[in-house]
C-alpha cells in the first residue's frame, strides 16, 4: 500500500462537516466512498484530515492522507477522484509520501480566514457573516492580544479528552477589502469552534455587547463553558496547512 497526501477544496454549505457521521453527508465520507468505488473494495479505506471542519465550514487548502493500492499515475488518480466526487469538493494536488506521514499530527501551522460582510448580499450568504459597519482599528487591537502562547479554554467547546487547551498564535489580524472584512489567524493548533468564538466575541465587543475588560479576562482567566458569542460557520475557511 502507498500513502497518498492530497490537498482539497470544498464548499461546506451542503456538508455536515469533515468527520464521518452515522447519518448525513460529510467530506470524509464522500472521499472514502469514492476511494472504495475506484478500487472496487468493500472494506473501508480511512481518510485522515488535517482539520476537522464543522458543518457549513469551507476549505481552500485542507490536507488529508490515505493508504491506497493502484496502478493509476498521480494525474490519473486525481482525474478518477474528481470524476466521481460532487462538484462542491475537488482534489487539487496529490503525491505519494512516506508511510509515517500524518496529515493531522505532522501539521505545524494552520491558517484560517473568517469573512464578514458589512451590508446585505445574497451572493455571500454562504460565504460570509453579515455585520454592521465596524471600526477596523479597534478590531485589530482586540486581534493583536491573541498573538502568542495562550490558554484558549474560554474560546472553545470543552472536551474532557483534551490534554490541554493552549495554542500558539503566530498571526491574528483583520483586513478590509471593499465591504468584506476578513479575519486572518495562523496557529499551531485550534480548539473546537475556537475561531468562531474569537470572531463572535470580537464583534460583540465592537457592538458594545461585551466590554473590553471582559474580553481581556476571558483570555487571561481561562474557564470552561463560558456563555460566549459564536460567529456562524459559513464565514469560516481553512486556507492552508503547513508542514515542516
Label each PLM-derived region with a short phrase.
Residues 1-244:
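Structured-RNA-binding interfaces characteristic of tRNA pseudouridine synthases
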